[in-house]
Structure formats: structure tokens, C-alpha cells
Amino acid sequence: MAKYIKRKSSTSRQGFEEFGTEILLLCQLRHPNLVNLIGYCIDEQEMILIFELIANGSLMEHFLYRDQDDPLKWKRRLQICIGVARGLHYLHTGVKHTIIHRDVKLENILLGESWKAKLANFVLCKKGPPSLSKALIRIDSVVKGTVGYLDPAYLRTSQLTDKTDVYCFGVVLFEVLCARRSVDMESEREQSMAVWAPACVEDGTINQIIDPYLIGKIAPECFKIYVDIATSCLREDNLERPAIGEVEVGLEHALELQEYADAAMRKDDVGSGSDQ
């Protein structure tokens, strides 16, 4: 059976330390929406992590190199996003100490069998206070992450919080809806999805930038909730962003509304067919 393998040079001290940190963390985590470590190997030249079978690649591959004849259906995209939210919810509240991923992006969302979302790449993770503590999660940290996903509050203060992951996930939600990268390098102004999409929501032009394949395929009630959630994740003030648990519940509700609308449409189709 094929496995997902991650390789890294062992000649760098920083790389070796990051590798060790990732192994220790992965050995403590068990959740269906986190990639499962099977084993690892270290020699003089290379460090290797061996993960479970990843049957359908990364989410990025399905947008950057997607098959134009078979793009991801809307419900599947929504289910993938719910899976990522569940994985993040577990990291933030389901382990002894809150864990902040810090690098939630399309490349780090892998798709296993049955298209189950698997959050991967824990190199940049930071451990916070006990997850059951009522203390506000704030960790002083050297700013790290990926351009296009970086939380402006984190950039400004160097204080890492669970809402940093929420911000990254908000970018992912709009990427999934629009089938566009977080930063459009082909644009003259190198537009950032985190700025551009909420601006389009505000001025009522969001329908003009969503994936053309999805036009007419998303139930209006589902669309509104999804867009509202994505926009709220990208609020400038991190205290105004929802917790990831709220995001998870909202996305699950959006899926329910989509399934209800799809069922109603099938019922109408059957009814109209029987009338002929």
C-alpha cells in the first residue's frame, strides 16, 4: 500500500529540531482529520516521516492542477472544509494543551480515502496554555507562516493566538469557493484573497469572483452562511473572529441547508416527471 512520505535534509540543525518537534507532537495526536504518522527514519543525510495512505493528494492540487472536466463538487468542498474545522477544533480544545497550527493552507490539507480531509505539516505548531483554561491564548512568537495567509494581528503584535488559525482558515474558505490562490500573482497588483474577497462581499460583487463551475449549484441559504463565516474569520481584530468550534457548527449548518435544497430539487424533478 502506498504511503505519504515527507523528506527533509538532516544536515541543518534547525531542520533536525523541527523534525523532532513534529515527531513528538504527531505521536500525541489522534484524530480522523489529522494526518496519521506511521513511522520515521533518520540517517546522515535525510530525515523521513511516513504517514498513512493519502489517496487523493492535497487540496491545492485539485485547484491548481484540477481536471477541468471533473472539478470538486460543492458538497464535497464543504465536507472537506468541515473536516479541516474539526481537526483544528481538536487541536485548539481536544488535547491537554492548546495547539496552534500556524500554517493552515491548501497545501497542508490532504485528502484521504473517501475524500476525508487530513490536516498535515505540524512543523510550525506552537503549544499554548491548558485547553480547559479560561486564560486568553496569547503566545509571544517569532512570526512564521505563509504569505497570503498571515494574520495581520499576529504580524502587528507577534502574539500568536488560536484566532491566527481561524484567519488562515478564512483564507482557505474563500480559496475553496473561488478556486483561486491566496495571492493572485498574475494580477498587476498581486491581489490578496484575504483583502479582495471580503471587499467583494461588502460591495455585493462576490458572485463575480466565485468558481464559475459553482454558479447555480449552491443553495442561496447555504451560500450566505458560508460567505458570512469566511468573512468573519478574516476580521482585522482577532477578538472579533469566531472560535473554530463556532466555524465548525456554522459550516455543518450550511451543509444541512445545501442537502435540504438538493433533496427538495430532486423531489420537484420527480414530481414534474410524473406529471408528464
Per-region residue spans from a language model:
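Conserved eukaryotic protein kinase-like
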Residues: 1-276
